[in-house]
Amino acid sequence: MIRITLPDNSQREYAGPVSVADVAQSIGPGLAKMTVAGKVDGRLVDASDVIDHDARLQIITPWDQEGVEIIRHSCAHLVGHAVKQLYPTAKMVIGPVIEEGFYYDIAYERPFTPEDLAAIEQRMKELIAQDYDVVKKMTPRDEVIQVFRERGEEYKLRLVEDMPDEKAMGLYYHQEYVDMCRGPHVPNTRFLKVFKLTRVSGAYWRGDARNEQLQRIYGTAWADKKDLEAYVKRIEEAEKRDHRRLGRELDLFHIDEHSPGTVFWHPKGWTIWQGVEQYMRQVYRDNGYQEVKGPQILDKHLWEKTGHWDKYRENMFTTESEKHDYALKPMNCPGHILIFNQGVKSYRDLPLRYGEFGQCHRNEPTGGLHGIMRVRAFTQDDGHIFCTEDQIQQECINFTALLQKVYKDFGFTDIIYKVATRPEKRIGSEESWDKAENALIESLKASGCDYQIAVGDGAFYGPKLEYTLRDAIGRHWQCGTIQVDPSMPERLGAEYVGEDGQRHRPIVLHRAIVGSLERFIGILIEQHAGALPVWLAPVQVAVLNITGAQDDYCREIAAKLQKALPNQGLRVELDLRNEKITYKIREHSLQKLPYILVVGDKEKAAGAVAVRARGNRDLGVMPLEAFISLIGQDIADKV
């Protein structure tokens, strides 16, 4: 007898081995029809898999998250089925599930076009309508090789070579099409009706730009049509907010083929960049950080000491001079430790906080570059706190409070807190890990933060806190971090004299709030859909005349605004063009300016201005001093 225990702890007995689908059928035909897969003793299996021992079983349906992911994975296989029917010479590579979707990498002699994508999607719908069963066959290794050799699927053969210890592999058959996978997959194509192919992009075999280029077809799939429609709306909203498009439309920056992965900042974009940097510089000053500046290029021997030369060299830009090897720094921490090492440091100097707007270079693959979000040259608000083990908790409390204020000023209040704990492979004693992890956890508790434990996600040398922003359309952006590091101070010989008169190693806390300024500005642009807060907007107010009769008064207004606020003038654009006022208002509105001041004869006679706020809000006519007070309050309130 086989005893099956269900999630409600009820039990069912069967005379012999029984499949997941059979168990579902014995419970009821409705459940059987909705069964995507099963979870046996916590392990996902196909609906056709047989249970031959007493076990706990959960029936997986499309309404379970695992069910949705299985649907997505099976949709990737369906892409393969459709592609091979339409383009028989295409070679299939891999088709995994990703967040909210899936993709399939394909080798083909020409790029797929939007018309190809539409044809593939249509063929997938036709295949789904055939309502065929997806058949799983566990197949001996030699037969798997034979199957793919006969079909000319060279990439599948390479993947088989990557698994020398596998004696048998799962082959999933979609009619004449076959794919290799660990599974599980849906039992029938009727589960795949709610899907959409979204785009095609380039990719590389094994993600390495030195390998052959592939094409990646992306798609999404859901259990319910409403979920798909909501997803499509989110994607459409994300496209409207795409920082690359807004960067062009608002004349902020561009990326040029002459320097891939680096940003050409235009005047308005550079104004935003300077605004973020100056704000963060004031944060340094107000919170006990000493700003430092390290060199861009450092000798190979330093990178050998830190371990980067062996483990990170492929991602570093290197050069040679006078028979010495150098590298552009991919991070700022070694330079800060070299600064710390100059002169004798005492326990009285700790915690010692260094901050730098350090430009770093990382040789990211071309295919991974993305606007100003993923670049090769970037500037970090990089800080390093040299402290003792006992000071970690308080420094983390201080850092979390500071980070929350900074994010709020930039328009983010929804933060996810994670503690990344010790990985399997690590250095240091268990006691030191216990103390460090406990300090991080207690710091979040003291800060009143709910947090998640990311088990095993810490670095090999220490745990860290990760701070992830949730933006206006629900996307997650991991920006802030504070990382405990007892290793690099030891590698580079950092010491301080303790209260006992002996030399000790400091702990280094690597910390960043915005991280890469380039990436953070990209996030800001998308968060605010280009309509940046008044204090950050590259142009805060435009002054528009109706006719030439108001030109001198408009110039007078602009001059006053540019000197209006203590220690800072407003960023003003004066538009005296001989164009219709409606045309000028529309043009400046499209540039997402916070305020537009319109001046006609009545306003000139009254010494006033007609104020239009962003979002086509008419605030009426007011004295110039009243407007200065209004915009000054906006800037002070960071809105």
Swiss-Prot record:
Q: How is the cofactor bound?
A: Binds 1 zinc ion per subunit.
Classification via CDD domains: TGS_ThrRS, ThrRS_anticodon, ThrRS_core
InterPro entries, per this entry?
Answer: aa-tRNA-synt_IIb, aa-tRNA-synth_II, aa-tRNA-synth_II/BPL/LPL, Anticodon-bd, Anticodon-bd_dom_sf, Beta-grasp_dom_sf, TGS, TGS-like
Q: Which GO terms describe its molecular function?
A: ATP binding; metal ion binding; threonine-tRNA ligase activity; tRNA binding
Cofactor(s) this protein requires:
Zn(2+)
Q: EC number(s) for this protein?
A: 6.1.1.3
A Pfam family reported for this protein in Swiss-Prot or TrEMBL: tRNA-synt_2b
Where is the protein found, in the record's own terms? Cytoplasm
Q: What is its main location?
A: cytoplasm
- GO cellular-component terms in the record? cytosol
Which residue ranges are recorded for the region named Catalytic? 242-533
| Protein's job | Catalyzes the attachment of threonine to tRNA(Thr) in a two-step reaction: L-threonine is first activated by ATP to form Thr-AMP and then transferred to the acceptor end of tRNA(Thr). Also edits incorrectly charged L-seryl-tRNA(Thr).
Q: Which HAMAP family match?
A: Thr_tRNA_synth
Q: How does it assemble?
A: Homodimer.
What is the protein name given in its UniProt record?
A: Threonine--tRNA ligase
- Record the organism: Paracidovorax citrulli (strain AAC00-1)
